[in-house]
Amino acid sequence: MVRIESSQPRKQRKARYDAPSHMRSKFLNAPLSATLRETYEKKTIRVIKGDTVKVTRGDHVGEEGIVDGIDTRNVKIIVHGVSSTKVDGTEVPRPIDASKVEITKLKLDDKRRVEKLGGKE
């Protein structure tokens, strides 16, 4: 079967919206900081709960926090300390796209993740 690729934005959005869960996981990759990139010799890695990230785009640029949760359905991450204020004054977490953050510290509790990273010893 031949795969037809389109450059139309509506078809790109539809493809992301209709993507199966194993593909959505790939959309949750975030770039590593310069020091981590040097250490692990990788540019991007999947964000997991517990990683420390720094926001690089948007209204919350420069803010740093720990990932509190991951929404695979909407392909967004929830960062501790990044929130919006509702009209009634309550704070609600602000979901952020994984490509708009930079991983500054990795959570290395998972042995499989450490093996996959490899890197310099």
UniProtKB/Swiss-Prot annotation:
It comes from the Archaea. Residues 1-23 are annotated as: Disordered. Keywords: Ribonucleoprotein, Ribosomal protein, RNA-binding, rRNA-binding. Coiled coil: none annotated. One of its GO terms (cellular component) is large ribosomal subunit. The keyword Protease does not apply. NCBIfam families: rplX_A_E. One of two assembly initiator proteins, it binds directly to the 5'-end of the 23S rRNA, where it nucleates assembly of the 50S subunit. This is Large ribosomal subunit protein uL24. It comes from Methanoregula boonei (strain DSM 21154 / JCM 14090 / 6A8).
